[in-house]
Amino acid sequence: MKPENKLPVLDLISAEMKTVVNTLQPDLPPWPATGTIAEQRQYYTLERRFWNVSAPEMATRAYRVPTKYGQVKTRIFYPQPDSPATLFYLHGGGFILGNLDTHDRIMRLLASYSQCTVIGIDYTLSPEARFPQAIEEIVAACCYFHQQAEDYQINMSRIGFAGDSAGAMLALASALWLRDKQIDCGKVAGVLLWYGLYGLRDSVTRRLLGGVWDGLTQQDLQMYEEAYLSNDADRESPYYCLFNNDLTREVPPCFIAGAEFDPLLDDSRLLYQTLAAHQQPCEFKLYPGTLHAFLHYSRMMKTADEALRDGAQFFTAQL
């Protein structure tokens, strides 16, 4: 699509979203647009530090868990001694960026608002890891904590998956993987999905939206996909294009959050419409005036805090 034909997104976003966009971090170096992935990861981690301060304090523990690919780092947040359930959180970042630190505040707020134990899984990033390694690491971590629940003082009788952006795809893909392969890790009570991608290759919002402000141009999306997938056939896998999976039965209750000016918004709309058409429990909420990745900015945006509260309330309502 000719760039001039796209919507003037930065003129249309909400006042609080504009404040975020215009927030400068003087000590931050320029984004290494032509740099290596390692340099981009370093920048992303530095940039997110500002947005992760002043998060709720609670007991937190770090553990490494075994998988067939090696050990994976996890971080457990304990908001209370007797948690009613455990939520596994998968961070976003286009499969190539992000870690437990970049999403620490999100996980702490989710634990605080739900009063459920939250476990962040630091799955191996792409292109070092190719599909479906990240999903298999997530499932392995889930199984490990299910088997060792007493040792870690967690309640694994009821669990959930949550994630933002690429992490939302991993969250739903992991839940479907457990269902399809009949793996018992406790009852999956719900899945919380913030502005994810679920398999669309083109859409109205992908044409009208996306730019340098969100890193979601058509070229960006292609780059993330090429880094994540092992081969062309993976594009049609039911654990990458989730619309190729069976969404007509036994899908855990899904909270689907969309950002108004997100090029991935149609993925969320289609997921909701598909699940609702087949009487699968789901809820969709659109957050007006927001860009992709707005969940990070709860330090400054009431809407981001609201979206986290909404997801937490949806999950606890399923327990």
Swiss-Prot record:
Give the residue ranges of motif Involved in the stabilization of the negatively charged intermediate by the formation of the oxyanion hole: 91-93
**UniProt GO MF annotations:** carboxylic ester hydrolase activity
Top-rank taxon, per record: Bacteria
Which Gene3D superfamilies did the record assign?
alpha/beta hydrolase
Gene Ontology annotations for the cellular component aspect, listed alphabetically? cytoplasm
> SUPFAM superfamilies per the record?
alpha/beta-Hydrolases
Q: Which UniProt keywords apply?
A: Cytoplasm, Hydrolase, Serine esterase
Q: What is its EC number?
A: 3.1.1.-
Keyword Protein biosynthesis assigned to the entry: answer is no
Q: Record's InterPro entries?
A: AB_hydrolase_3, AB_hydrolase_fold, Acetyl_esterase, GDXG_lipolytic_enzyme, Lipase_GDXG_HIS_AS, Lipase_GDXG_put_SER_AS
Localization terms from the record: Cytoplasm
Q: What is its main location?
A: cytoplasm
Record's keyword annotation contains Chaperone:
no
Please explain the role this protein plays, according to its UniProt record.
Displays esterase activity towards short chain fatty esters (acyl chain length of up to 8 carbons). Able to hydrolyze triacetylglycerol (triacetin) and tributyrylglycerol (tributyrin), but not trioleylglycerol (triolein) or cholesterol oleate. Negatively regulates MalT activity by antagonizing maltotriose binding. Inhibits MelA galactosidase activity.
Which family is this sequence assigned to?
Answer: Belongs to the 'GDXG' lipolytic enzyme family.
Assembly with partners or alone: Homodimer. Interacts with MalT and MelA.
What is the name of this protein?
A: Acetyl esterase
From which source organism is this entry? Escherichia coli O81 (strain ED1a)
Q: Gene name, please? A: aes
